[in-house]
Amino acid sequence: MQHELLNGVIPIIPTPFLENEEIDEAALRNLVDFACGCGIKAACLPAYASEFYKLTDEEKLKVVKIAVDQAAGRIKIMAQSNHPSLKSAIALAQANVENGADIVSLAVPRIFTLPEDSLMEYLSGFLSAIPETPVLIQDFNPGGATISPSFIKKLHETNRNFKYLKLEEPLCAPKFEEILKITEGSIGLFEGWGGLYMLELLPLGIAGVMPGLGVADILQKVYEHRINGSNEKAFSIFERVMPQIFFSLQNMELFHYAEKELLAARGVLKNSIARKAAYIPDHSSKKYISELNERLVALAQEI
C-alpha cells in the first residue's frame, strides 16, 4: 500500500459536552476548524484525551463522522478505535474507515496484564481486518512495560499497514532509537504524554508528537524550529509551554479539565465539562491552571 508517512504534531481532539453531558456537535465542529488552522497535517479522536472510555460505541463513531465531515480534506482524520474486545475493535475500525477516516488508531489493551503472544494475536487480527488502511498502534501503560522493539519489528514485518507507533513513557530515548534502527525508519514513531519529551526525541528521528489540541499550534512551531536547527527558538517556546503540560498530566482527568479550560480561554470552547466521573480540582489548582492557560494564550498570540 502507498502511504506517505505523516510528521509533526498530531493533536488529540477532545470531546465537548453540553450541560446534560450529551456531545456538543457544534463545539466539536469548532474544535476541528481550530485544528485545521494549527498548521498540522492530521488530528486524532476519540483517544484517551477525548474521554473515549466514557463514550458509547455509537458516540465513538459519531465524533469521527463529524470530524471527517468538518475537516473536509483540510487535514487527515485519525480514528481511534479502542476496545478490549478484538471483535468490537474491528467493528469500530471498519465503520470508521467506511465513514471516511484516513488512518485508524488502536490502543494496546491494558485492562489486565497479557503475555506478548496474546497481544500479537490481538493486534495482528486487528491489522489484518483493515489491510488497506494505515494504522497507528498506541501503547499507554502507566507504570508498566510497553511492547518491546522485537515485538514491534515482528508485527510490522507481518502487517504492512502498521505504519505508526505511539509510545508514552519516561526515559524512552534508548528504546525509541532501537525501534528506529531495527525497523529502518519504516514506522512513523510518535511520542505521546503531551509532547513532554519532544526536544530530546526529535533529534533521534521520531516523526512527531501527539499532544492535546490546545497547544497544537504552539508545539508545531517548536517542532519546526527543532528539526530545522533553530534550537534556541525551539527551547524558548517550549520552556514557556512545558509548565502547563507538566501540571495537567499529573492526572488524566485533571488533564481534561485543564485542556478544555485552555480551549475556552482561546475562544474555541464555551465550557470545560467532562463526563462524570470527572476530576473536581480544588481552588488552588483552578487558579493555577487559569494562570498557566493565560500565559499560553499570550504565547500563542506572540508566535
List the model feature ranges, each with a label.
Residues 30, 62, 154, 233-237, ...:
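Short, solvent-exposed alpha-helical surface patches in well-structured domains
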Residues 10-14, 38-39, 197, 203-206, ...:
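C-terminal alpha-helical cap/extension of soluble enzyme domains
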Residues 2-145, 263:
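Active-site beta->alpha loop and helix N-cap motifs at the rims of alpha/beta catalytic domains
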Residues 75-76, 134-135, 163, 187, ...:
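Secondary-structure boundary/capping signal
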Residues 28, 60, 64, 89, ...:
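A general structural signal for well-ordered alpha-helical segments in protein cores
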Residues 27, 59, 151, 284-285:
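Single-residue recognition of alpha-helix capping/boundary positions
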Residues 127-131, 140-252:
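Catalytic alpha/beta core domains of metabolic enzymes, predominantly
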